Amino acid sequence: MNIKDIGVIIAKKPLKENTFIITVFTKNHGLYSGVVKEFSKKSKFIYQEGNIIDFLWQARLHEHIGMAKCELIKSYTGYFITNKTKLYAFNSVISLIKELFHEREEHSKFFSFLINYLDNLSKHFCFRDYINFELALLAETGYKLDLTKCGVSHVTTDLIYVSPKSARALSYEVGKPYKDKLLMLPRFLLSDNSEITLEEKRQALALTNYFFNRYLFHNNRQVEARQTFIEYTLNNF
């Protein structure tokens, strides 16, 4: 059985000498893992995490892990390796995909979203883009937040809270009596022009973290690469 697709390498682990298992997030087939062999400097460069590749997967049966062959399309390593913020953001997003998506589950629209994010990240790091990535990931896994209008009154102004139950924004007037039980809605998520304060960064990460923990991170288990990104971001404002 053969699978041919374009993909992003999101994980690589050693199997034996010169042999590795790579996990690839493919455009049309979701996550696929395959065995690759490295016998040259060129092949070592091809199989780096974050590389966009032409991916060929071959196995006798679909349920087997299979062998993989890859041709490099684009490498992001040089853009990220010299910038800690970019590197930690990159490590976080690929670790989240690896953690939250199931093997061989198609996410073709999200694949395009990821490629666009990596292209933007290679140019510059934007905290707003990172949080929008996490929000998109929540939506892709079935937990979309509606931050466009108040979930009760339907007004589109003065939105400052998010309900942890409905995942909808709430206006100041509606949410005020229950503010101690609500999540804060960072202002920058409502306006592309606003400056992002340290407190708003904390609010944004607390917002996505709540829904990750409630629905997706089993037993409150955190993704280590994401925690590293959060700590670095909040401590280097």
Swiss-Prot record:
One Pfam family, short name: RecO_C
GO biological process, any: DNA recombination
Record flagged with keyword tRNA processing: no
Record keywords, A-Z: DNA damage, DNA recombination, DNA repair
Disulfide bond among keywords: no
Organism superkingdom: Bacteria
Gene3D superfamilies: Nucleic acid-binding proteins, Recombination protein O, C-terminal domain
InterPro entries assigned: ARFGAP/RecO, DNA_rep/recomb_RecO_N, NA-bd_OB-fold, RecO, RecO_C
GO cellular component, one term: bacterial nucleoid
Family recorded in the similarity comment: Belongs to the RecO family.
Role played: Involved in DNA repair and RecF pathway recombination.
Protein name: DNA repair protein RecO
Source species of the chain: Rickettsia rickettsii (strain Sheila Smith)
Gene designation: recO
